[in-house]
From Swiss-Prot:
<keyword id="KW-0813">Transport</keyword>
<dbReference type="InterPro" id="IPR012292">
    <property type="entry name" value="Globin/Proto"/>
</dbReference>
<dbReference type="InterPro" id="IPR000971">
    <property type="entry name" value="Globin"/>
</dbReference>
<feature type="domain" description="Globin">
    <location>
        <begin position="2"/>
        <end position="142"/>
    </location>
</feature>
<dbReference type="GO" id="GO:0072562">
    <property type="term" value="C:blood microparticle"/>
</dbReference>
<dbReference type="InterPro" id="IPR002338">
    <property type="entry name" value="Hemoglobin_a-typ"/>
</dbReference>
<keyword id="KW-0561">Oxygen transport</keyword>
<dbReference type="InterPro" id="IPR009050">
    <property type="entry name" value="Globin-like_sf"/>
</dbReference>
<keyword id="KW-0349">Heme</keyword>
<protein>
    <recommendedName>
        <fullName>Hemoglobin subunit alpha-1</fullName>
    </recommendedName>
</protein>
<dbReference type="GO" id="GO:0005344">
    <property type="term" value="F:oxygen carrier activity"/>
</dbReference>
<comment type="subunit">
    <text>Major hemoglobin is a heterotetramer of two alpha-1 chains and two beta-1 chains.</text>
</comment>
<keyword id="KW-0408">Iron</keyword>
<keyword id="KW-0479">Metal-binding</keyword>
<dbReference type="GO" id="GO:0043177">
    <property type="term" value="F:organic acid binding"/>
</dbReference>
<dbReference type="Pfam" id="PF00042">
    <property type="entry name" value="Globin"/>
</dbReference>
<dbReference type="GO" id="GO:0020037">
    <property type="term" value="F:heme binding"/>
</dbReference>
């Protein structure tokens, strides 16, 4: 999915409000996904995935850090996430069907905490951005 100039502007604008809150947003999005979609827990059988756990916070920070990197390189998301795509496909072997599930929960959390900034057009742009990231991460699966 190609991001328009408006999409890129909208994503960069809302990400200014995400900065400094990546860990909390990521942890909440993961917790919501694991709670509402229990099958997504299978990749973390030995981890404490309860609300507020240190694992959720550290992994949430990683997830949102990768998204922040994609925002910073929004004109070359493929290049920015190439190594992460390799890792997910070859090492972690996460089912790419889970990427849209996490994207949905990230949008939910952004809607809760950044409601005034998540206008209809920004929501649409962030949705397209997250779909693009999911596509890039899944691109190296075979």
């Amino acid at each position: 999915m190609k991001l328009s100039a408006d999409d890129k502007h909208n994503v960069k604008a809302i990400w200014e409000h995400v900065k400094g809150h990546e860990e909390a947003i990521g942890a909440e999005a993961l917790c919501r996904m694991f709670t509402s979609l229990p099958t997504t827990r299978t990749y973390f059988p030995t981890k404490d995935i309860k609300e507020g756990s240190s694992f959720l916070h550290s992994h949430g920070k990683k997830v949102m850090g990768a998204l922040s990197n994609a925002v910073a390189h929004i004109d070359d998301i493929d290049g920015a996430l190439s190594k992460l795509s390799d890792k997910h496909a070859e090492e972690l072997m996460v089912d790419p069907a889970n990427f849209p599930k996490l994207a949905h929960n990230i949008l939910v959390v952004l809607g809760i905490h950044l409601k005034p900034h998540l206008t209809y057009s920004v929501h649409s742009s962030v949705d397209k951005f997250l779909a693009t990231v999911g596509y890039v991460l899944a691109s190296k699966y075979r």
